[in-house]
Amino acid sequence: MIYNIYNKVANITLFSLLILFFMSSCSDEMSIKMQYGDRDQLFKQKYEPIPGPRTCFWRRGPVSKDPYINIAYPDAGVFYWNAAFTVPEGAKLYLEGEFPHARYMSLISYDGRGAPIESLADYLIIPNHNSTNPFIDGSKRKNRNRSYKVEIVNLPPEIRRKEGTRIDLKSDIKDSNIDKNNSNSNSLNAAQYGNGQQSIVYRIYVPDKNRNESGGVPLPEVVLVLNNGEELRGEKACDALRSNQAPQISIDAIGLPMTVYSKLLKQPGKPDTWPATVPPTWYLQYDREFLLGIYNGQLPKSFRKSTGGFYPNLDNNYVRTIINRKHGKVFVLKGKLPNTPKTFHGDEFMSKGDMVYWSICSNQGFANTRVNDCLFDEQVPVNNKGEYTIVISRVEDRPRNAFPECGIGWLPMADDGDGAIDEDVTVIQIRNMLSSPEFKHAIQNVSDIGKEKDIMGPYLPFSFYTTTGAFEVLFPCMN
C-alpha cells in the first residue's frame, strides 16, 4: 500500500516537472514556483468520520446505506456492527444490553467466509428480572426496564433452530413474566475459525423515528469473566479479547473478486444483458454456489436458505432478480405487501403480522455489494387492497408520477450500474423476515427452485420494463 502511494506521488511530481519544463521553454516570462509542501496540498481532503456510534468491541460499523459503511448488501433501513475477537481459554464472555426501540434486533455469528452460524433473534432473548422484552407479541414497546444478558459461547450449535420462521414460544405473552423454564437459553454459539477468531454481527432494523442508529439505547456492553473469576469491562475486556485484531476472512466474504465477477459477466455465447431476462427471473437465496448459479447455472450444494450471500441474516429469506437497463430505462414492479407490525412511529404495542419485516432493495453488483436504497414495509405506498407499484430507474429517468403522493414507490438505479463493469446492471432483492407459520405465501415456504410464483402468488411481484413517458401515461396521477 505504501509502495503504491509512493509511486502515485512520484508520478504526479514528474508530471509537474514536465509542465515546468514545457512552459519555461515556451516563454521566459512564465515560471512555476515549486515549494516544499505543494505535494501535500494535492492530497489534502477534509476528514469526515463515519457517522454513528462505535465502541472498542463494536469497532466495525455502522454498516448501512450511504453515508455509512456500504458493503455486503446492507438493508438501507438497518444498522449493523461487527465484532471480531478471541475469548481467552477458560474465560466467559457476556453481552449486557438494553432492547432497542426498533422493529427487530439480533446477534448472529459467522465463519471466515461470511456464512452465518447461528442467530439469536430478539424474541428468543429472556429479559433480566423485572424487565420486559418489547419484541414479544403484545408487549409494551416503551417500557423503561428493557435489559438483558447474553453469553457468547465458543461452540458450534448442537441443535439448529428453524430458520427464517418465527418459532412459537411460551414467551409470546403480553406481560414481562416470561417462563424462565422454556427451551430457549440466552446464549449464542460463535465457534472459532482461522487462528482462533470469533465473529458476531449486531443488527437493528428500523429504529423508531427520532431514535439514533442504535435505537435510543447504548450498544451492548462487553463483560469478560476470566478463569480466575476476575471481571473485565470496557477497554480492559477489549484488550483481553483482542477485539482490534484484523478480520480473518476469505477474499469473497464481502464481495466477489473482480476476476470471478468478470468471468461471470463475459461468458461465451451469452448476450451482453446476461443474466437479465425478459420477463425477469427470480431466484431464491441458498448457498454461494447457487448465487453464482444465477450467472452460470450451477445448482446449490446445500439447500439451507439464506447462507449464500455476504454476511446474510438467517432470520431473512431472500429472492432476487438481476435487471439490465438495456432492456428498458424504467423497471416496474406490481405486487401485494404482507401484513407487518407497525413500529416506526413509536407504536405502543408490538403486534403480530404475516412476518416481522419486509423490504425491497436496489443494489449494485456482486463485486461491489453496495446498496443504492431500499423501501421497507411502512414506506411502501399501497392501495386499499394492500397492493403496491414500485418504479426503479436512474434519477434522470424517474417518471414525474413515481412519488408517494401519486401512490407510487421509487428506488434509484446507480449511474454506474453494478459499480464495477456494466453500468446498466442492478440487483433487486426482496426480504421476508421471520414469517408466521400461518402465512403460506412467504419465501420461507418455497422449497423447489422455479416454484417461487406458485407459492408466493401476488407476494412475488409481476414486473416489466418500460419508458418514462409510457409509465406516466399508464399510471395517471390526479394529485
Residue ranges and their predicted role:
Residues 23-25:
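C-terminal motif of bacterial Sec signal peptides marking the signal peptidase cleavage site
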Residues 2-13:
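Bacterial N-terminal signal peptides that target proteins for export
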Residues 13-21:
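Bacterial N-terminal signal peptides
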